[in-house]
């Protein structure tokens, strides 16, 4: 529901549609209601896309750290095998305001982000080219206005997410 833009006030305010307008490209969003769980079937579906401009891997909010560790590289490799030169962007989960008060939640997000970062570093070290990383820091701001429930993006949350990720998208598309 985060990826599908479930709490945007209208479809055009979901971040995928904003990115589509910003880049003048069609964006396919394969995040369905809590199901960004590194399922290999989704990686195969992504790999089957003809002539993609780039891929954004934003599964961290729904995955567990253990799942990222055990399946993240295989998920990536399925896509990379089909599209060896296409840019792939890895995105961290955002630290929403509730994590200031809920240390368990903060630790959970931190451990998932650390696994994502470790995966990215392993791939870079192994010689992977054309991969990019978007850290969580500064993603949504700290005023509490970016989410409806400390999880799902409001319109302003979608806009802030796009503002945070667009410099990396632009760099990847050069």
Show which residues each predicted segment covers.
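Alpha-helical cap/lid subdomain in secreted, periplasmic
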Residues: 39-174
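Serine-esterase "nucleophile elbow" of acetyl-processing enzymes
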Residues: 1-32, 42-48
């Amino acid at each position: 529901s985060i990826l599908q833009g479930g709490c945007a006030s209208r479809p055009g305010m979901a971040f995928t549609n904003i990115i589509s307008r910003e880049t003048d490209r069609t964006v396919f969003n394969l995040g369905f209601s809590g199901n960004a769980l590194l399922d290999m079937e989704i990686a195969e579906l992504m790999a089957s896309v003809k002539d993609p401009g780039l891929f954004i891997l934003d599964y961290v909010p729904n995955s567990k750290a253990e799942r990222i560790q055990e399946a993240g590289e295989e998920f990536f490799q399925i896509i990379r095998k089909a599209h060896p030169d296409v840019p792939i962007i890895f995105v961290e989960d955002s630290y929403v305001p509730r994590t200031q008060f809920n240390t368990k939640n903060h630790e959970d997000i931190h451990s998932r982000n650390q696994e994502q970062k470790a995966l990215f570093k392993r791939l870079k070290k192994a010689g992977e080219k054309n991969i990019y990383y978007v850290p969580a820091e500064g993603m949504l701001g700290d005023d509490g206005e970016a989410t409806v429930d400390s999880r799902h993006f409001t319109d302003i949350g979608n806009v802030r997410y796009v503002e945070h990720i667009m410099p990396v998208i632009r760099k990847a598309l050069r």
